[in-house]
Each structure stands twice: as structure tokens, then as C-alpha cells.
């Protein structure tokens, strides 16, 4: 269902792009627009990950420089049968994370220092599982293509408007051409923006569900989303504000003013996502114990003692709701860090 909807929305964006090209230069303009889209997408396919990581000043880490964070990602990737992605840290106080890369073999995940400092190991695992789900679903490529096409539509729309519909004026239909230019300038970019946001919202729900399956506990991600949403919008993310086209990449919209689950939001409402994850937790009861190999009686409300290795030593507990905690009493065997060493300074 989600794949079909995404394919239909992408097809609509491509048709919209070609339509704007037709307004600019007739049938020739439509062909040129299609070729232009292909060129832009080819460039984005090979370079988008490098561009966005450089844009946010991300630095790569490994098992020596950030052992716990790296181990979480490695263990989750292995559980999802994915290649080991590159692991990055962004020096930003806003708790957030994203994934990028053209395919699972060339993927990367990035988490902010704010996220690593404020979340427990279990919550970080939930977030990273969500990002790995995006990689598994190839959402990173899908969103790159939609962002590229949306930007190209906006560019062509401006060009069509300033052309003033010249191809129609010679036939005494200047007004029709002007109307076409206005449509290209305002309606087409607006429609492309709505489609891009719709694709983003669709994929977030799918990544939440698959991420919960990867880590084995939907409540870890639900708790992480609650904390990120609670503190994220109080911290100004300068890079994201200057590059709003990348907002859809993050697990929570990094821009100020993100509100309800509407046509104009890049992400579903956090409350709706948490509710869906809680329902999934109920569905997974029993299956978690049978399939995940739980063997430690450590409640999720306890702090992850070795998670202070990540950065500053800040630690937080997970959900405080006793009814939620009591339903999930154990931590899976793969999430143990008793032998992790502190990162080298």
C-alpha cells in the first residue's frame, strides 16, 4: 500500500514537471524538462549523501571513537540483515537524526550530540532502527528524488512565468499564456510541495513500524519520539533553518513551527506516531519474548549505565508510565554494553 502510494505520487510529480516544461516550451520544452529531471536525479543519486553530510558538518565515528553508539548501529544493522552503514555524529544540541545514501550498500546514519546526550541507549536504538528502516525501504533515495524534482519544478515555474507564455502570444492568446505562466509559478510548485510532504509522511509511518520490528520494542522509539519532540523545537537548528528542503530527512521535523498532521507537515504528528507504536507494542506482546532472546531482567525505566560513554554523560530514563514499563520488563541480549570501553579523547 505504502509502496504503491509512493510510486503514484512520484509519477504525479514527474508528470507535473513535464507539464511545466510544456508551458515553457511546448513539446520540446516537455522533452527538455524530462532530460533535465534525469540529469538532476543522476547527480543527486551519486552525490546527495555527501552534500547533506557536509552541509551539517557531520563527522564520521567508529568503534573506537564512539563505541556504544557504533555498536548499537552495528547490532541493529546485523539484525536487519543490512550492510554496515557509515556512522556520523552532528555537533548540534537539537536532538535529531537522519539517514542518507543511495542504497543499503552506500548508506550512512547520523545522530546529533543533543540526541546522544539526552536519550538512553534503548531510545537511541529505537531511533537508529527507524533510520535503518528508511535505508532498508530505500526511502533515502526516494526522498532525494522527490526533493530534486520539487526543486526543479519550482525553478521551471519561475522561468515559465517570466517567459510570459510566449509560445501562445503569436496566436493572439497572450492572456492564456500568462495564465499558464501563473499556474506554473504558483500552482505547480505548491502541488509538488504537497506531494513531497505526503510521500514523507507515508514513509515515516512505515519506518516507525519496521524500526520497531528491527529493535524488538516499539516503546523504545515511542519514548524517543516523545523526548525529541518535547525538546527539539526549543533548540534552534541553524543548518536546518537555512536548508529547509532537508527537513524531511530527520526523524522529527527540525524546523520551528511544525505542528499538526496536516497537508503542510513533512512528518506525521508525533502524538499519532506514538499512538501507532503503542498499538504495535500490544500486537508484539509475546512475540518479543519468543523471538528476541530476552535474558536480562533489567527494566527499561532503569538508566543505561554505560551510555555515558557517548558524549557528555547525560542520562535519562525511558517512559515514566508504570503501565507501559511493566509490560516490557526485559532488555534483549544484543543490547548489552558491560564490556564497552570509554571512547578515546
From Swiss-Prot:
Binding site for Zn(2+): 130, 134, 204
Membrane topology summary: Multi-pass membrane protein
Highest taxon of source: Bacteria
EC number, as in UniProt: 3.4.24.-
Signal peptide coordinates: none
Pfam family, one: Peptidase_M48
Cofactor requirements of the protein: Zn(2+)
Subcellular location: Cell inner membrane
Keywords assigned by UniProt, alphabetized: Cell inner membrane, Cell membrane, Hydrolase, Membrane, Metal-binding, Metalloprotease, Protease, Transmembrane, Transmembrane helix, Zinc
Record text on cofactor binding: Binds 1 zinc ion per subunit.
GO cellular component, one term: plasma membrane
Protein name (record): Protease HtpX homolog
Origin species: Bartonella henselae (strain ATCC 49882 / DSM 28221 / CCUG 30454 / Houston 1)
Gene this chain is encoded by: htpX
Amino acid at each position: 500500500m505504502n509502496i504503491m502510494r509512493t510510486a503514484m505520487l512520484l509519477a504525479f510529480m514527474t508528470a507535473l514537471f513535464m507539464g511545466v516544461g510544456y508551458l515553457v516550451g511546448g513539446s520540446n520544452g516537455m522533452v527538455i524538462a524530462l532530460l533535465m529531471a534525469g540529469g538532476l536525479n543522476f547527480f543527486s543519486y551519486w552525490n546527495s549523501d555527501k552534500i547533506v553530510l557536509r552541509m551539517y558538518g557531520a563527522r564520521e565515528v567508529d568503534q573506537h571513537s564512539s563505541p556504544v553508539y557504533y555498536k548499537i548501529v552495528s547490532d541493529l544493522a546485523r539484525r536487519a540483515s543490512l550492510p554496515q552503514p557509515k556512522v556520523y555524529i552532528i555537533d548540534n544540541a537539537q536532538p535529531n537524526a537522519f539517514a542518507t545514501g543511495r542504497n543499503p550498500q552506500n548508506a550512512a546514519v547520523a545522530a546529533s550530540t543533543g540526541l546522544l546526550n539526552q536519550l538512553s541507549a534503548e531510545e537511541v536504538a529505537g531511533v537508529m532502527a527507524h533510520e535503518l528502516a528508511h535505508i532498508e525501504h530505500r526511502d533515502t533515495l526516494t526522498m532525494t528524488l522527490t526533493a530534486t524534482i520539487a526543486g526543479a519544478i519550482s525553478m521551471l515555474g519561475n522561468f515559465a512565468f517570466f517567459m510570459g507564455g510566449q509560445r501562445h502570444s503569436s496566436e493572439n492568446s497572450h492572456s492564456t499564456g500568462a495564465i499558464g505562466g501563473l499556474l506554473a509559478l504558483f500552482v505547480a510548485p505548491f502541488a509538488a510541495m504537497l506531494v513531497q510532504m505526503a510521500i514523507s509522511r507515508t514513509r515515516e509511518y512505515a519506518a516507525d513500524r519496521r524500526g520497531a520490528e528491527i529493535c524488538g520494542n516499539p516503546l523504545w522509539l515511542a519514548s524517543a519520539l516523545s523526548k525529541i519532540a518535547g525538546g527539539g523545537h526549543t533548540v534552534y537548528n541553524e543548518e536546518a533553518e537555512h536548508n529547509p528542503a532537508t527537513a524531511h530527512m530527520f526523524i522529527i521535523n527540525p524546523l520551528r513551527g511544525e505542528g499538526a498532521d496536516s497537508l503542510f507537515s513533512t512528518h506525521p504528528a508525533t502524538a499519532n506516531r506514538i499512538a501507532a507504536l503503542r498499538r504495535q507494542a500490544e500486537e508484539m506482546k509475546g512475540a518479543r519474548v519468543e523471538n528476541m532472546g530476552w535474558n536480562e531482567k533489567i527494566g527499561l525505566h532503569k538508566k543505561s549505565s554505560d551510555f555515558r560513554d557517548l558524549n557528555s554523560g547525560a542520562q535519562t530514563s525511558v517512559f515514566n508510565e508504570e503501565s507501559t514499563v511493566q509490560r516490557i520488563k526485559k532488555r534483549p541480549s544484543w543490547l548489552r554494553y558491560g564490556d564497552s570501553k570509554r571512547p578515546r579523547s
